[in-house]
Amino acid sequence: MIDNTRASRFRSVGLNLTAGSANTVYTCPNNFTSKVELLFVCNKTSGNKTVQIDWHDTSTGLTYSIVGGYTVSAYNFLKFDQAYLVLNAGDYLSITPEAGSTMDATVSVEQYFDPATRV
């Protein structure tokens, strides 16, 4: 259960993505539950490139696609900020940009102390 007597903490993480490979962009730490509030993927390539975004649920060992093969236009971005995704300890987000692309990702989360959650 989340401990509401302790303040939550905010964190942003940025990563230069490796093209053609799954890149872990954020992992929820032990003893925390994280609310993903913002996710940016920026295409810095002169051509349109695809991106795949996955959520890995460690409690079930399953992977769920959030975005599968979405085309990000040249010098454009994909932004998620109209809803939340809740990650438990050990859950992580990965982004796989198309081979030959140059992309960056930024994730902003609010982390809540939750001593009951561990990997």
What residues fall within each predicted segment?
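Short solvent-exposed strand-capping/beta-turn motif centered on an Asx-Ser/Thr pair
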Residues: 41-46, 98
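Short beta-strand/loop motifs in extracellular/secreted proteins, especially
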Residues: 37, 47-51, 101-105
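C-terminal interaction-tip segments
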Residues: 1-34, 96-119
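Short, surface-exposed beta-strand/strand-loop-strand elements in extracellular ectodomains
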Residues: 46-69
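Noncatalytic modules at the cell exterior or secretory-pathway interfaces
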Residues: 84-99
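Short, solvent-exposed loop/turn segments enriched in Ser/Thr/Gly
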Residues: 32-38, 88-89
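Exposed aromatic-hydrophobic patches
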Residues: 77-83
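Short proline/glycine- and polar residue-rich coil/turn motifs
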Residues: 70-77
